[in-house]
Amino acid sequence: MNLLRRHPVAVTLVVLLLLTAIHPFPALVDAVTGSAPGDADLDRPVLYVLFAPISDTLDALTFFSQSRAIWALTIWVLVLAAWGAVRASSDSFGWRRVVLSALVGPVVLVLLALAALVLPRPVPRLVSDGPGTVIDYHAHTNASHDGRPGWTLAKLAAWHERQGFQATYVTDHNVLYDRSMPAPEGASVTLLPGVEWSVYRQHVVAIGRVEAVPRDSFSESTARMVRMFSTIERQGGFSIASLPEYWRNHQEELGAFVVAGLDGFEIVNCAPKALAFPSDLRRQVISLAESHDLVVVGASDNHGWGAVTCVWNVSRPGAQGFHTNRVFSRPLALVQGDWQGWTAPVTQPWFMLRSLSWSERASWLTWVLIILLYRVFPRREGQTAGIGILARSIWRRPRTTPPPPPQSARL
């Protein structure tokens, strides 16, 4: 009890790490079957595992649906600010110290969120034992209006290469990539032609042989929009309905998509708005695709923000229709849509800890132990233990002169 009273955060974290190890998530889930694939896994770099508390936290901040991110960051900022203020006020510091202490936690959280968006770092890569090409069906460069500035074809290719992709379709918003631009020199990832058309309340990914289309003629109603699928087919291309638009805007009209000639559906998309896709609707779309022998795919939907993907595809050689593609997803991405946004401050850390591999879990426990020992044991004689040493270097207190001994002691 004394340890819990003195170090509640460390003890609580150790308990959570042990509890979540009882029923952990697999590293990957087949988004169609819901089971762990036996022929694919994630290869985690040494530095990723060594600094697992940072790596996993940045991943968890990346795999956030939009509504859950808003709830979690808001609540975490308020809790961290209140905690810092209470700790400082209990030590009878001045109001300036209380304010500064209240700001430390929120500032660190914001910096972590920014790091998740822009910081280059070690990331897991897919390793597949089965035949097939590891491919991404939906990714952007700075040619898209919402692409990260400076996010060139070379950077997009390098981003995919680090994570085990062998090929990716380049699908900028309403901008054709037809291989007329030279491929990045030395890139081992094959860049394939594609485009993402913005039409009536829907984004349509067209891949393969892509040509310009009169978008205005598909932008007034659903009935006119679905004609795009047959237009893409006549061009020799392949059409995929993108998330989250078909789920949010056309959920009751997906049958019309199929009748009009759609070739496939995204069932996992790493964009924050698309991560809220509920699993029951995903199963309905998978069932619809299977019954009509349509392709289902996962999409990083990368725009240059974030270092890591939540999904990979393995395209089977010689297969067609529904069995063309296998979709492997990080579990943390699949569970987002089944939980209300207000639960995110608690459920996101819980899901993150359940997602840890044994090597990552060992890294977490090691770091907790190191920090706990640093806080418990004094660094030199006469000095109190712990990170207080660092704190004293920042908030140096004035030294007090000991009172003179009593007169009787001098005699």
What are these model-predicted stretches?
Residues 161-162, 233, 258:
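Non-catalytic positions within long, well-ordered alpha-helices that form the structural scaffold/packing
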Residues 179-192, 285, 289, 294:
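Short acidic, glycine/proline-enriched helix-loop-strand junctions
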Residues 203-238:
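Binuclear metal-dependent hydrolase catalytic cores centered on His/Asp/Glu-rich metal-binding motifs
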Residues 1-135, 145, 154-155, 200-213, ...:
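Charged catalytic cores and adjacent phosphate/nucleic-acid-binding surfaces used
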Residues 178-180, 190-194, 245-254:
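Alpha-helical scaffolding within the catalytic cores
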Residues 144-146, 152-180:
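N-terminal carbohydrate-binding/catalytic regions of secreted carbohydrate-active enzymes
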